[in-house]
Every structure is written in structure tokens, then in C-alpha cells.
Amino acid sequence: MTSNFSQPALQLCYENTNGSCIKTPYSPGPRVILYMVFGFGAVLAVCGNLLVVISVLHFKQLHSPANFLIASLASADFLVGISVMPFSMVRSIESCWYFGDAFCSLHSCCDVAFCYSSALHLCFISVDRYIAVTDPLVYPTKFTVSVSGICISISWILPLVYSSAVFYTGISAKGIESLVSALNCVGGCQIVVNQDWVLIDFLLFFIPTLVMIILYSKIFLVAKQQAVKIETSVSDNRGESSSESHKARVAKRERKAAKTLGVTVVAFMVSWLPYTIDSLVDAFVGFITPAYVYEICCWSAYYNSAMNPLIYAFFYPWFRKAIKLILSGEILKSHSSTMSLFSE
């Protein structure tokens, strides 16, 4: 006797290949929606951060150590958008990796390197803002272009060296070879590292984040004190000199920049905290996190690369003006690099 009910056919990533991963595709409706959502994030990360880089490099008024750091941060986020997110999008939605083992390693390496590079950039930007707000008179001599260059170099070299060591030496899988072998299949690209390296990953997130929290806490305390002093001084002396007025405007601008970048730091922490906690816990409970939970955490982190340009556009009038000049083609005109972007 045969049953009238048949099990749905098992789908594989590669139908005619032994050891293929099992494919668990979405139905057409959710599939289209996910491609639109993830694709929009990738396009926003690429286009938005490219506008930031062009703005800082083209307009001479933006050539400052702090803005060079911001441009370098935007470069890291741009690379996440163009080299990581599109391929992760296909993997997340199709539940298969179709780009080969070699590119899987490269993709994972770039994923980790560029994301940790963003964290280090934000950490150095916090240091820059701390000096600018707490010691504005000596800031130009302390945080020079050469110092900014050193910070940028560290923010790129350390993550690249670390991620290369993790994915190309095999040391991250030491002690869990049997688990890696069990999870390995054709059409898969899953990052599995041992508990020691998961702890290192957590520290690479936690230490810069802790530094940022401490520095921005001090920044906002100092900024509040400065605001009170300036209000008192203006009310006591209506006829203040132009020099004092200029100092007050500069201090106000530095505080506003610190607040804006503080929002950027908060966005980074909110975006990355779920993924970091999930990775830490998962390594100690046998990697049992459901696929959909992992994907939510992962894309929450990816979307951080698309958020920074939106934050700049919302808080920085100069960035909005730069975008208009770029999109209208005004930057193609001669002497466009010397245009004024600030209202004062």
C-alpha cells in the first residue's frame, strides 16, 4: 500500500553534487521583499558613503584631520556595501553560497576586517572629539594631519592582519575540527571559530566601545559646562570682543560635531550589540542559534554601514550642501573645490 501523502522534495544547493548543503528557500513574496530590503541597504551604504568620501576629498574647506578620519570610516563602510553585503544578501535569502570556497574565505575576511576597521575609526574619532572639546586651544597642535594618518593606518592594518590570521591560518578552528567538518558542505559559507577567538572578537568590540562610552560621557559633561560658561559670559558682557565671539562659535561648532558623532557611536553600538552577544553565546552552547536569528543580527550590523551618511545628512548642513553640489554637477566646474560649505 502506498501513501497518498508525499513528503516535499528536499532541495539542495547543488543538485548533482555529493555533500551539497540543504537549501531552504523563501517563498516568492518574502523573497522579493528581502531582496529589496537588503539591496536597498547595500545601495545606500555604497552611494551614501561614496558621497561622504567625495565631499571630504574634493572640498578644501573640509580638509581637516577629523574629516579625514570620517572619510576613511566612510571608505570602510563603502567597502562593506560593495564587497560584503551583496554576496551576503544572496547567501541569506537563497540559504546557499554560490561563489566558491576561495571567495568564501575572502568574503569572510573582508567582512570582519572592514567592520572592525569601522569600530577602530569610531574609537579614534572619539579621541579626536575629546581633545577638540576639552582642550580646544591646543587641539590643532595635538591632532594634526600626521596624527590622523597614523590613526587611519592603525584602523586599517590591525583589522586586516587579524582577519587574515583568523581565516587563512586555520588557528581559529583549532579544537573544533570535528564540528567544522560536520558543518562543512558544498554551497555553505559559515563562520565557525573556537571559544578563544570568539572571546577575542568580543574584546575587539567591547574595548573600543568602552573607550567611546567613557570619552563621550566626559565630552558631554565638559560641553555642558562650556555652554553654561558661554551663556554667563555673554549675559555679563554684551560688548564682547570679536575674538571672544569667534571662540564661542568655534566651541559651539565643536560641541555640535561631538554630539553628531556621539549619535554615530550609539548607532554603531545598537547595530552591533545583538550580533556580538549572539556570537559570544553561540560559541559556548554549540552553535544552536536559529538561522533566522543569526541573519537578523548579521544584517543589523551590516545596516550600520548605511546609517552613518544618513546621520551626517540629518545633522550636518555642510554635508547636505555638498551633496547638492555633487549631484547637480557643480563640482565639475573650475574652483568648485574652494566653495564655502559653512554658513558662518
Swiss-Prot record:
Sites where a glycan is attached: 4, 18
Disulfide topology: 21-185, 104-189
Entry keyword set: Cell membrane, Disulfide bond, G-protein coupled receptor, Glycoprotein, Membrane, Receptor, Transducer, Transmembrane, Transmembrane helix
Gene inactivation effect: Mice lacking Taar2, Taar3, Taar4, Taar5, Taar6, Taar7a, Taar7b, Taar7d, Taar7e, Taar7f, Taar8a, Taar8b, Taar8c and Taar9 show no visible phenotype or behavioral deficits. They however show an absence of aversion to low concentrations of amines such as 2-phenylethylamine, isopentylamine, N-methylpiperidine and cadaverine.
Membrane topology category: Multi-pass membrane protein
Extracellular side stretches: 1-31, 89-111, 168-195, 282
Membrane spanning residue stretches: 32-52, 68-88, 112-132, 147-167, 196-216, 261-281, 283-303
Matches recorded under SUPFAM superfamilies: Family A G protein-coupled receptor-like
Cellular localisation: Cell membrane
Gene Ontology MF terms: trace-amine receptor activity
Tissue spec: Specifically expressed in neurons of the olfactory epithelium.
Source organism per UniProt: Mus musculus (Mouse)
A GO cellular component entry from the record: plasma membrane
Name of this protein: Trace amine-associated receptor 8b
Segments on the Cytoplasmic side according to the record's topology features: 53-67, 133-146, 217-260, 304-344
InterPro entries documented for this protein: GPCR_Rhodpsn, GPCR_Rhodpsn_7TM, TAAR, TAAR_fam
Main location, first listed in the record: membrane
Family note: Belongs to the G-protein coupled receptor 1 family.
Function, as annotated: Olfactory receptor specific for trace amines. Trace amine compounds are enriched in animal body fluids and act on trace amine-associated receptors (TAARs) to elicit both intraspecific and interspecific innate behaviors. Ligand-binding causes a conformation change that triggers signaling via G alpha proteins, possibly G(i)/G(o) G alpha proteins.
Any single Pfam family the record assigns to this protein: 7tm_1
